[in-house]
């Protein structure tokens, strides 16, 4: 703790098997521009560094800035920064307009089947979706085992042939269903769950908002069985 430095520093510095390789902090409220704790934490970090310097300790590296701090305050940059979201071309929601960014990732699949269902027929586990009229339902091989949140069922959308198409019914382990009644959709058509198609875009922030979560959780959920393809810009 910052208020225990006078007691703990002498004990740490007296240990023969320890050396100060780096000094760092991690901001609790960097993505909340109106929160006073950000400035207070930066002041306490400066006091801790001064306490070390007064005892002749010079750290090889000083770092504090995550993506949000990097965008809002150059005084946090020191000699290293720790961007997370920014590496993916994303920014914390409250700071989205500070820097022009282009998302560096997309999540895509393909339609594997298309079926016509009658009014009153259901789709998926627990029959959560019941058609109120004849509908055309497409199956996409992506589910919660890939990291898609189950709350996207009935809330989320995907892009197919440049159009937004709603996710219907429950998101299952390996598949989800979309209502493809608004236009032609066929097996093999590309489905964009995150990314751009036909001038429209499904963003990580949008997906997070639809499930009442945050961008970080959406990204961290994406599982290892998703095939990664790396493209040069």
Predicted regions and their residues:
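Active-site loop/helix belt of alpha/beta enzymes
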Residues: 1-118
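C-terminal accessory subdomain/extension
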Residues: 116-233
């Amino acid at each position: 703790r910052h208020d225990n430095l006078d007691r703990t520093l002498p004990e740490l510095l007296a240990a023969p098997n320890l050396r100060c390789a780096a000094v760092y902090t991690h901001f609790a409220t960097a993505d909340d521009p109106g929160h006073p704790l950000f400035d207070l934490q930066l002041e306490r970090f400066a006091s801790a560094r001064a306490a070390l310097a007064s005892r002749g300790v010079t750290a090889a590296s000083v770092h504090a800035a995550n993506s949000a701090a990097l965008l809002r305050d150059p005084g946090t940059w020191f000699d290293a920064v720790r961007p997370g979201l920014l590496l993916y071309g994303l920014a914390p929601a409250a700071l989205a307009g500070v820097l022009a960014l282009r998302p560096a990732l997309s999540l895509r699949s393909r339609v594997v089947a298309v079926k016509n269902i009658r009014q009153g027929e259901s789709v998926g586990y627990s029959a959560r979706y019941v058609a109120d009229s004849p509908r055309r339902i497409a199956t996409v091989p992506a589910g919660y085992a890939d990291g898609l949140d189950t709350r996207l069922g009935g809330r989320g959308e995907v892009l197919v042939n440049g159009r937004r198409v709603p996710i219907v019914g429950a998101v299952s382990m390996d598949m989800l269903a979309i209502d493809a009644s608004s236009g032609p959709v066929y097996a093999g058509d590309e489905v964009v769950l995150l990314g751009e198609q036909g001038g429209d875009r499904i963003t990580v922030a949008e997906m997070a908002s639809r499930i009442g979560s945050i961008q970080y959780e959406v990204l961290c959920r994406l599982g290892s069985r998703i095939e990664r393809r790396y493209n040069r810009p």
